[in-house]
Amino acid sequence: MDIFRILSRGASLKKSKDITTDYAVPSRKQFVNEKQKEENLKSVVDKEVDFFHTKKHTSHKETEKKNDEGEDEIEDEVPPLTISSDDDARKLRKLNKSKVSGEDIPLPIGSFEDLIGRYKLDKKLLSNLIDAGFTEPTPIQDEAIPISLEGRDLIACAPTGSGKTLAFLIPLVQTILQSNPNVKNYGIRGLIISPTNELAVQIFQELNTMTKGKKMKIGILSKQLANKINNKIINSSKYDILVSTPLRLIDSIKNETISLSKVEQLVIDETDKLFDQGFVEQTDEILSNCTNTKLRKSMFSATIPSGVEEMAQSIMKDPIRVIIGHKEAASNTIEQKLVFTGNEEGKLLAIRQMIQQGEFKPPIIIFLQSITRAKALFHELLYDRLNVDVIHAERTPKQRDEVIKRFKSGDIWVLITTDVIARGVDFKGVNLVINYDVPQSAQAYVHRIGRTGRGGKAGKAVTFFTKEDDKAVKPIINVMKQSGCESGYSGWLEDMHKLSKNEKKDVKKHEIKRKQISTVPKIMKQKRKQREEMIDASKRRKQESQSNTE
């Protein structure tokens, strides 16, 4: 059997004869049994190299049991964990590194089956969870689901890729299923707000999976749906749950084509962004239109600064606060590294060195601070014959969706982007995140590198910095320390002075002015400029000559 052919199937990676770099496929060390018979090798390897799990794979449990002749003992199936006492809860929270504060805190759950006995979880909802491959809850789900099902307001902070979306979708769907008024076009009862269209689409896809087989109307307020609602082609009251970005929803509210008066469950995802400048007024307007006296609010994010938390607390009723790990720490599955490149030219050289040394293992996401710089790096890496594309705010939603789809399917190996996809968008198999430009805050850093190391899988994040980044890099070091990644930076960086509040604000508000991305020598640039000037001068002389002739 041709092993290389098998290894190259699952991810659909397009290869070129011109590419000589050794792009390593993902490691096989996680295989349960390397001695499986030849007929099982294909399916196992296909699953390994299917970076983003876009294909359905059957369980290998039975096959492993039959073929693992060297194993004398097979582990007994562990019964679902149930939490029935404060002592059980304390042990679980210690294990999960969960910090929970508030009055009358419900016990966490130890398994999804635990929800059946305690909250009569809808059987079809549980079946949909299992069919989607969700067999046991994550730490944030352990806490957030019972808190929400008890009808309590919630502020939740957990690392990127830790399952926050399911943590609010499961109780949202369950609550609405239980409170079905059996009235046609009753009105929107569940509302989910997210800062970006990409994240809204992803949430809607998860919601669609959870509600499969149930008589529940769900919608995402896309441009097309908003137009139909605003033109009264569709009645918005038909929807039980609506997912939307703030501005589009506000536009429909002002047109009086969407009413939020029946909303019982409000979820604000990426709370730190939606309570930040530029979004906070929109968020406040949405909240003012949610007039139901029984309204329950949930707020989720990977980072929640103190100022944002204070604002959130002020609009909530007796909330419970859940922190998994540290408030501004990255997932412990991400290996973080700071690389000093000296100057801007050194960044491109650093990428090319990573390629030569075999550290450039796709899929990869590269973040830059501006659209102009993202475009420039895209063209530079195209010259290196890399399988690369770029996504930014100037591209249409349709173009961005297509690029994301191609990246997930493996047609694109390297995705260059701005912060437009830094939040929430789930790429399950990203091996490496490169911060070509240092992010302007600890929150932005955590969200960027959170595109890797998701769902408990290992990932790596590399951040390039120059002499101009002396202030911007300090918050990054603090996140790395909280995440246990002290080995990822040089010791002399510890001696940098602590930033004042004003310095932090200044770094966050003002982008560092950087040189143009290019490795073209200075003398070549001068020659190009001289040539362009000569061409322009020739054109002017020709135009003047034509004018004189006339």
Swiss-Prot record:
Cystine pairs: none
Functional description taken from the UniProt entry: ATP-dependent RNA helicase involved in 40S ribosomal subunit biogenesis. Required for the processing and cleavage of 35S pre-rRNA at sites A0, A1, and A2, leading to mature 18S rRNA.
MF (Gene Ontology): ATP binding; ATP hydrolysis activity; RNA binding; RNA helicase activity
Short sequence motif DEAD box: positions: 269-272
Main enzyme class: hydrolase
Similarity-based family: Belongs to the DEAD box helicase family. DDX52/ROK1 subfamily.
UniProt: ATP binding residues: A158, P159, T160, G161, S162, G163, K164, T165
Swiss-Prot/TrEMBL catalytic activity: ATP + H2O = ADP + phosphate + H(+)
Top-level taxon: Eukaryota
GO biological process annotation, one example: endonucleolytic cleavage to generate mature 5'-end of SSU-rRNA from (SSU-rRNA, 5.8S rRNA, LSU-rRNA)
Motif Q motif: where in chain: 114-142
Gene Ontology CC: one annotated term: small-subunit processome
The protein's name in its UniProt record: ATP-dependent RNA helicase ROK1
Native species: Debaryomyces hansenii (strain ATCC 36239 / CBS 767 / BCRC 21394 / JCM 1990 / NBRC 0083 / IGC 2968)
Disordered: annotated segments: 53-83, 503-550
Gene name per UniProt: ROK1
Keywords: ATP-binding, Helicase, Hydrolase, Nucleotide-binding, Nucleus, Ribosome biogenesis, RNA-binding, rRNA processing
Principal subcellular localisation of the protein: nucleus
Pfam families referenced in this protein's UniProt entry, alphabetically: DEAD, Helicase_C
Domain notes from UniProt: The Q motif is unique to and characteristic of the DEAD box family of RNA helicases and controls ATP binding and hydrolysis.
Record's subcellular location: Nucleus, Nucleolus
Subunit structure: Interacts with the U3 snoRNA and is associated with the 90S and 40S pre-ribosomes.
Bias (Acidic residues) ranges: 69-78
E.C. number(s) listed in UniProt: 3.6.4.13
Domain Helicase C-terminal residue range list: 333-497
